[in-house]
Amino acid sequence: MPMQGAQRKLLGSLNSTPTATSNLGLAANHTGAPCLEVPIPDGLFLSLGLVSLVENVLVVAAIAKNRNLHSSMYCFICCLAVSDLLVSGSNMLETAIILLLEAGALVTRASVVQQLHNTIDVLTCSSMLCSLCFLGAIAVDRYISIFYALRYHSIMTLPRAQRAIAAIWVASVLSSTLFITYYDHAAVLLCLVVFFLAMLVLMAVLYVHMLARACQHAQGIIRLHKRQPPAHKGFGLRGAATLTILLGIFFLCWGPFFLHLTLVVFCPQHMTCSCIFKNFKVFLTLIICNTIIDPLIYAFRSQELRRTLKEVLLCSRWPGCWAEGGGDSVWPGSCVTLRGPLPP
């Protein structure tokens, strides 16, 4: 097809720099050693993206519907869901367009494909940056709620949270526009890698400090009630396991993508690096998996949000199901307002 080159560009600017891309073929020709390339079927990729879309839409709907969830913490969780939704949605859109172009079902000019390529790349990059930023914002919010509990509501006011959210979105869009425009500069890719490492360090420091404070608090309760020390040790182990899972999932899902960017800068012509470049779609799939896991970690653990989500799902069958205000709901044909969990 005459547009094959333009179609391939939809795979994303961050896949590799032009230098790296041009040398991948040479590396493969000079060495007969096979590369480990993990194929990701388009159907699987689109299915994971769809699961992420549905999951995060439900989180946004539940938070928007229940006024009890209109706090700074849930605002950050809602924005994390929106950014994760955009991450999965933009990658699904890109994959769908490529499949349509390759199948000949979508015929358009190369200039239009190029505009789509630029738009989707900016959307993907900005949503990724937002997702990382809101993960950091949630960590900061929880840190303040623990170490400044008495002043929390005066520090983390809703207007301040809204200003922080607006600043994150604006900064992410502007930064991603610059990153995509100058993606072939090594400094741009290094900035992205440094930003990821900064978020990782920030989250690790804050959550480790929170775990230490929780262990101290548990130890104080044990001494007060004169209980046996093993109970405190068990609490510390559970907390350490939870922290390891939280940070481990974050690193495993995001780390390979930023490792890819690092290798693009430092070893674009190395044979081993060229093999890693071939698994770029695997790294994107891991990020999609992270957008599926985020609601399970940050949203669905809230009993209030789960209750509201249950109401949203049950009341979706009747347009007039919801009563005005809060998360209260009214069954159709009844004047009884349910303020507790809905019956199964």
Swiss-Prot record:
GO terms for molecular function: melanocyte-stimulating hormone receptor activity. Pfam families: 7tm_1 (PF00001). It is a multi-pass membrane protein. Keywords: Cell membrane, G-protein coupled receptor, Glycoprotein, Lipoprotein, Membrane, Palmitate, Receptor, Transducer, Transmembrane, Transmembrane helix. The keyword Lipoprotein applies. The chain crosses the membrane at residues 38-63, 73-93, 119-140, 164-183, 192-211, 241-266, 280-300. The keyword Transmembrane applies. It comes from the Eukaryota. This is Melanocyte-stimulating hormone receptor.
